[in-house]
Amino acid sequence: LKSMKIAPGINRYFAAEKWNCVPSDVWKEQREIAKANEKRDCDFRAEGYDIDELALEVAKKNAKLAGVADRITFAKRDIKDFELNDGFMTVITNPPYGERLLDVKSAEELYKVMGEKFKRTQGKSYTIITPDDDFEKIFGRKADKRRKLYNGTLKCQLYMYFK
């Protein structure tokens, strides 16, 4: 969405649209401005992988709702089969973890595999969301940048690797 300058939530309804203090034409006008600023002709392509078929179906549905389904290739694939491609690459992942889908030991094994697969290479960046405070130690290197965030009600860290 960011590459194509598609505004988040452009196709959804907001409860604030019923507020009397904001004229309804303001919402319409801002949506028109946002749509006029979209860059549908950009060279954006993406790939989405998961080992869970249901997760892939949800991702496909969301991509369609966002209007980017034709630019994303989805496939069932394990992280163990991940390979770096040539050129620029950004990996963004929200892996399963102890509190969400996996037990702690399995999550730690996954982080180790990610550390082996996500090599420090020019033109490659990695962003990982997890609540695990020991992630960097298990992954094998310190993040270039960290941010606190919530994934729903779960306190997490956003670990960014780009150097």
Mark where each language-model region is.
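Conserved S-adenosyl-L-methionine
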Residues: 1-82, 99-100, 106
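Alpha-helix C-cap/termination motif
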Residues: 66, 85, 120-121
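Conserved Class I SAM-dependent methyltransferase catalytic core
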Residues: 41-45, 49, 53-57, 101-163
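A short acidic, Gly/Pro-enriched loop at the edge of an enzyme's catalytic core
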Residues: 80-91
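Short coil/turn segments at beta-strand junctions that form active-site/ligand-binding loops
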Residues: 44, 70, 87-89, 124
